[in-house]
Amino acid sequence: VTAVVDMPNTNPFTSDQKTFADKVKIATSKSVVDFGVGINVEPGLVDRPWFDTIPSAFWKLYPYGITSEDYFGLAEQVLSKTKKPLVIHGEHPDFMDDKPLTNLADHTDNRLKAEPECLSRMPPSPYLHIAHLSTFEGFKRKPSLATSEVCPHHLLLNLDICHSINCKVDPPLRTKLDNQGLYKAFKEGQIPILASDHAPHTVDEKESSTPPSGMPGVETMVPL
């Protein structure tokens, strides 16, 4: 692990100067590797007086609880006014279904086209970074100039291997063909970053009837 970045959807949520500064202070006193703290993208962000001056490592845009019009509109706004990375969770809000899950495959079926449809609409920009690529089709459709990353679980795990609903992650686990395509792209340097997408949920949370999405990626990177 060469760098750790704090996503704004952790506790406390990061969308203001004070929370950002508090997290930087804690990380400065404890981190033994490079670190970065991100700020959530939300309406009005680019109009805040500190937008151009706050020393955030990156901006982060999520597709949850937002219309597709607002999601892509915010991406364009930020990219037009920043020289810091805009990190996106690249799933199209219109292609993310919330149907109840009875098994792990349901979660994948609910989002079959979400990543490719999202990335094909994103504008080309060297400041756009696509977090946790999960589909080979999404990789092929990502905009020119954009950077990207992939996680071990999207390189090595798939629905043929994992059946338990406690393997639920966002974006979902995909197919063996997606594993193979992404692994080849990673091996050839077309995807330059291996990321953990660390989500430190407890065993009890993951074994519940409604497990949260995510894997403890820092612990599982080496075993995988």
Where do the model's predicted regions map?
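Metal-associated gating/positioning segment near the N- to mid-region
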Residues: 1-30
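Short, ordered loop/turn segments at secondary-structure junctions
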Residues: 8-10, 40, 64, 91, ...
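Short helix-capping segments at alpha-helix termini
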Residues: 28-33, 144
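Active-site beta->alpha loop and helix N-cap motifs at the rims of alpha/beta catalytic domains
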Residues: 37-46
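Histidine/acidic residue-rich metal-binding segments in metalloenzymes
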Residues: 49-194
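Short, conserved beta-strand edge motifs with alternating hydrophobic and charged residues
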Residues: 193-197, 203
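Gly/Ser/Thr-rich active-site loops/lids in small-molecule metabolic enzymes
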Residues: 211-224
